[in-house]
């Protein structure tokens, strides 16, 4: 590459810290909004941002993520790669946003709620601005400028939370939330243009159609695979919105939405691995890639498994505390959603994007699972209602992740001897179950305690027992102990673990 690359740990810690700050800021939004709006307004709000979120996930078609493939490999064409991404996102954003603004009935067709039509213009403008500015974090990370990326993540989430909450508290209307979204998108777009001018001087001065064609050829199958993945992630929500009331959709979306911390560590790690594995693959270092991937699976499992078990034993208390008692009926969907958490550690994207020859295999698998999801969801909805839709989604996501992870290990020539790198996963599961049983004992001992108290005490008890059990079992490595000690020594003046010299 011709440039020194920061270590994986260094980059991941920076991005993880930023995402943790961003995550805790995002908790403020649902806690506040569910106390300002009634269930119907919450349903409309979540339908609006479902449409916006789907558009911002699907429309880039992998163009933004192509930066992770090209920027680590290129020295002379970096500006050409960046301007292609800028042009593509601006064009598709204008086309989609303009179509929704000019033909608002599109919204009522998508979610079967004519109430959204009155917001069409603002929804279209939000899609354009969020789509365009959404490349900011990825471009900085692909450029291995993790400090800037971390700063953008924190600033974007803080400003988003402050702006949306201010508009919600002052105006107390759905349209005010869209005003806030447009303002936020404008701020981030200006930040993007400033960063691109600083990191890629003169990027706007030259366009090469042959490079654009090459980049399009690379991203086309991955973009379609990404479309299939996003469709799979969001389609079940659209099916529920189509067949049930806005109030029912609000309940469903709370339980089936993003779980606490589900993307925080994974996204930080994947963002770093995308660029690093692309570079390693170019040099033919398959063994190093295999070790990196399996160690990443192990680290993610150490977090996702306990969070899943904790949600099973404290899910009701979590819903009441965060979303109030009016959303406690979201619990069955939250339980099904939690089943996917352990599988979230089985990351595949960094390898499947670096090994371009397998792009079409990924596309075929995701399209096949999308078809299965449609068949299962529409078949079960008449017998099991919303539970049937959610169960269909969980089944299809599970099957897809297992298939793609198996493909990833085959690409990397993994053997049975390599699985020793993830043998600690069983220790994490055992420790989480032990901690979960202790929390159940706490709930039995305090049957009349307030849910908020049970959540706080239960989470603290679970964390302590889990960490002690994992440490005693030997599932924490010395380098991980040192990293934890550095963090706790810096902020708490405390060394948690004893590490051998």
Predicted regions and their residues:
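Helix-loop junctions and terminal segments of transmembrane helices
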Residues: 30-31, 59-76, 141-142, 255, ...
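Interhelical loop/hinge segments that connect adjacent transmembrane helices in multipass membrane
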Residues: 1-4, 8, 174-175, 190-234, ...
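Membrane-interface junctions at transmembrane-helix termini in multi-pass inner-membrane proteins
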Residues: 70-73, 129-153, 175, 338-367
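Transmembrane helical elements of multi-pass membrane transporters/channels
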Residues: 10-26, 156, 180-192, 196, ...
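Signature of the first transmembrane helix
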Residues: 6-64, 88, 93-101, 126, ...
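Hydrophobic transmembrane helix module of multi-pass membrane transport proteins
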Residues: 53, 87-228, 233-234, 440-441
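Membrane-proximal transmembrane or re-entrant/amphipathic helices at the cytosolic face
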Residues: 2, 416, 440-501
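N-terminal membrane topogenesis motif
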Residues: 1-26, 76-79, 83, 147, ...
């Amino acid at each position: 590459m011709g440039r020194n690359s920061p270590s994986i740990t260094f980059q991941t810690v920076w991005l993880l810290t930023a995402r943790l700050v961003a995550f805790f800021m995002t908790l403020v939004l649902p806690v506040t909004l569910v106390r300002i709006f009634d269930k119907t307004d919450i349903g409309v709000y979540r339908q609006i941002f479902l449409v916006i979120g789907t558009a911002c996930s699907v429309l880039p078609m992998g163009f933004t993520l192509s930066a992770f493939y090209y920027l680590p490999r290129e020295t002379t064409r970096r500006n050409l790669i960046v301007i292609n991404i800028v042009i593509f996102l601006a064009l598709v954003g204008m086309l989609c946003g303009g179509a929704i603004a000019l033909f608002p009935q599109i919204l009522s067709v998508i979610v079967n709620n004519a109430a959204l039509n009155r917001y069409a213009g603002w929804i279209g403008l939000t899609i354009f601005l969020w789509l365009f500015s959404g490349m900011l974090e990825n471009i900085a990370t692909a450029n291995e400028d993790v400090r800037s990326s971390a700063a953008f993540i924190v600033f974007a989430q803080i400003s988003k939370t402050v702006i949306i909450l201010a508009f919600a508290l002052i105006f107390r209307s759905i349209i005010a939330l869209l005003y806030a979204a447009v303002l936020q998108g404008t701020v981030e777009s200006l930040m993007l243009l400033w960063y691109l001018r600083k990191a890629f001087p003169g990027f706007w001065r030259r366009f090469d159609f042959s490079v654009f064609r090459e980049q399009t050829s690379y991203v086309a199958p991955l973009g379609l695979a990404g479309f299939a993945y996003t469709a799979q992630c969001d389609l079940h929500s659209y099916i529920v919105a189509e067949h049930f009331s806005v109030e029912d959709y609000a309940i469903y979306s709370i339980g089936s939405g993003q779980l606490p911390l589900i993307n925080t560590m994974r996204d930080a790690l994947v963002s770093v691995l995308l660029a690093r594995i692309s570079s390693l693959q170019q040099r033919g270092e398959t063994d190093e890639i295999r070790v990196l991937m399996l160690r990443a699976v192990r680290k993610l499992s150490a977090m996702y498994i306990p969070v899943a078990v904790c949600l099973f034993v404290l899910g009701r208390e979590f819903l009441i505390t965060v979303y109030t008692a009016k959303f406690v009926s979201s619990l069955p969907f939250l339980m099904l959603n939690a089943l996917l958490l352990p599988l979230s550690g089985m990351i595949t994207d960094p390898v499947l994007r670096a090994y371009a020859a397998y792009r079409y295999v990924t596309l075929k698998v995701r399209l096949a699972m999308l078809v299965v999801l449609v068949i299962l969801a529409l078949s079960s909805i008449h017998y099991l209602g919303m539970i049937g839709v959610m169960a269909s989604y969980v089944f299809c996501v599970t099957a897809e992740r297992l298939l793609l992870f198996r493909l990833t290990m085959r690409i990397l020539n993994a053997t049975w001897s390599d699985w020793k790198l993830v043998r600690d996963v069983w220790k994490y599961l055992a420790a989480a179950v032990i901690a979960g049983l202790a929390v159940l004992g706490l709930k039995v001992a305090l049957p009349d305690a307030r849910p908020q108290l049970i959540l706080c005490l239960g989470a603290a008890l679970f964390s302590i027992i889990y960490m002690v059990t994992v440490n005693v079992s030997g599932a924490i490595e010395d380098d991980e102990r040192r990293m934890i000690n550095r963090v706790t020594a810096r902020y708490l003046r405390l060394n948690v673990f004893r590490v051998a010299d």
